[in-house]
């Protein structure tokens, strides 16, 4: 144990440059690293946890917290993780972690080979959990992806409704009965919105049996079964032409080695005047590798790509990238809402699962919020067409589409004014709140 202590002691002595980290080791000794504020405490209570923190901290910190062998002292897990991230960014990463990061980078393409059976197992790992769990921290529509906060003052329900309208505007749903394919349709919220509010005919495909059952029930209860259907299907099995394709929060599960096939599938599926919109988590600091704890416990086989990693596949497919938008802190705000709701319902969630599971989810939500605030992650939305002239030459039509749906929600036929006119937050909130309350 002495050698493990020495190695971790040396790594922390080098890393901590901002604030003070007080570490209590398994032998009862306490060492302080750095100086000044903030002052953060950490207890490592077992030799196993100490060994893990020495040789594989990217995995061991989360596992130790789940098992109660690593605990924040005098602070929250969020505060501890933020402290460590800030110091890793400025003081340098743990030397063993740098070596493991290189190894993860070297084998990342192998880790992301996701044939259909493996993709199904990966999805079941996270999405086929007790549906009541997600109802306790997501919005009423169960949108498990980045919301859209134009002012930052929106409620979670408002921001998720705005996200769906923002995406719908980019799909240019300019006539009724457009056939839409929703890849990774989740609990059905996007598909139901496109059918109800835009007159589309939507097919949602998912690999989650739990989500499929909920989505079908919601469509029936909403009286939309004639316009929306949901299927248990891998995207690679789809072979029918459609007018529009939307995919929100699914692309992270495709895998690097499958990007060419994914975008070729989009091109082959879209009709000549078709439009696709892909919304996914990405990284602003270039290609990387998935954290080992996230890969093991939360999203096996998943990866959040930089835009530079997807564009070669887009270009090879022959599709036009007609619009790319980077959403920076929107997901951090989304997850902050989820964390607060999870904390408020923690006892009820524990009754459905177990304490270790609750700790896992607490660690997950805290860590993921922080990578969007501190560690270069963001969301990107990319709009794609087959033809160069499918869409107008400027983005004004998107604003007009969002203005139109706000007008409908307020019971008006239109909102007066030309393209580019500012819609007051109060007016938008009235519309979105009314819409969100009806979901």
Model-derived regions: residue spans:
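Conserved SAM-binding loop of SAM-dependent methyltransferases across substrates and taxa
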Residues: 187-198
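Conserved beta-strand signature within the Rossmann-like core of class I S-adenosyl-L-methionine
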Residues: 273-281
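Conserved SAM-binding loop
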Residues: 215-216
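Substrate-binding/catalytic lobe of Class I Rossmann-like enzymes that use SAM or dcSAM, i.e.
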Residues: 281-392
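Conserved class I S-adenosyl-L-methionine
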Residues: 176-184
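A short glycine-rich, Lys/Arg-flanked "PGG" loop and its adjoining helix->strand segment in the class I
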Residues: 260-272
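Feature captures hydrophobic
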Residues: 1-160, 166, 173
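A short acidic, Gly/Pro-enriched loop at the edge of an enzyme's catalytic core
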Residues: 236-245
């Amino acid at each position: 144990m002495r050698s493990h202590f020495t190695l971790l002691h040396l790594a922390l002595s080098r890393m901590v440059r901002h604030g003070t980290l007080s570490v209590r080791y398994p032998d009862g000794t306490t060492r302080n690293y750095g100086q000044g504020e903030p002052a953060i405490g950490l207890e490592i209570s077992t030799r196993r946890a100490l060994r893990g923190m020495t040789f594989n901290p990217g995995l061991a910190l989360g596992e130790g917290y789940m098992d109660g062998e690593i605990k924040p002292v005098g602070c929250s897990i969020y505060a501890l993780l933020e402290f460590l991230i800030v110091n890793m960014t400025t003081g340098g990463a743990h030397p063993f972690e740098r070596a493991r990061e290189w190894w993860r980078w070297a084998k990342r393409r192998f880790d992301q080979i996701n044939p259909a059976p493996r993709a199904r197992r990966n999805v079941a790992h996270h999405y086929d959990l007790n549906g009541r769990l997600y109802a306790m921290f997501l919005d009423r529509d169960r949108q498990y992806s980045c919301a859209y906060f134009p002012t930052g003052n929106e409620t979670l329900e408002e921001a998720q409704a705005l996200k769906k309208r923002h995406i719908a505007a980019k799909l240019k749903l300019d006539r009724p009965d457009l056939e839409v394919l929703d890849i990774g349709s989740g609990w059905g919220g996007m598909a139901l919105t496109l059918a109800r509010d835009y007159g589309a005919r939507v097919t949602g495909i998912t690999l989650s049996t739990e989500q499929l059952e909920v989505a079908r029930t919601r469509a029936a209860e909403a009286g939309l079964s004639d316009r929306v259907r949901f299927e248990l299907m891998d995207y690679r099995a789809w072979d029918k032409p459609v007018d529009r394709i939307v995919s929100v929060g699914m692309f992270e599960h495709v895998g690097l080695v499958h990007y060419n096939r994914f975008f070729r599938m989009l091109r082959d599926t879209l009709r000549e005047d078709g439009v696709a919109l892909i919304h996914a988590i990405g990284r602003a600091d270039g290609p990387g590798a998935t954290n080992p704890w996230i890969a093991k416990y939360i999203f096996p086989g998943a990866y959040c790509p930089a835009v530079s990693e997807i564009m070669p596949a887009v270009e090879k497919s022959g599709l036009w990238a007609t619009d790319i938008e980077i959403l920076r802190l929107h997901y951090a705000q989304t997850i902050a809402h989820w964390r607060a709701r999870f904390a408020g319902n923690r006892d009820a969630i524990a009754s459905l699962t177990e304490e270790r599971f609750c700790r896992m989810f607490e660690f997950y939500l805290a860590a993921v919020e922080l990578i969007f605030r501190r560690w270069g992650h963001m969301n990107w939305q990319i709009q794609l067409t087959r033809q160069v002239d499918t869409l107008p030459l400027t983005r004004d039509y998107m604003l007009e589409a969002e203005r139109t749906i706000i007008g409908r929600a307020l019971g008006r036929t239109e909102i007066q004014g030309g393209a580019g006119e500012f819609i007051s937050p109060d007016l938008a909130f009235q519309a979105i709140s009314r819409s969100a309350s009806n979901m």
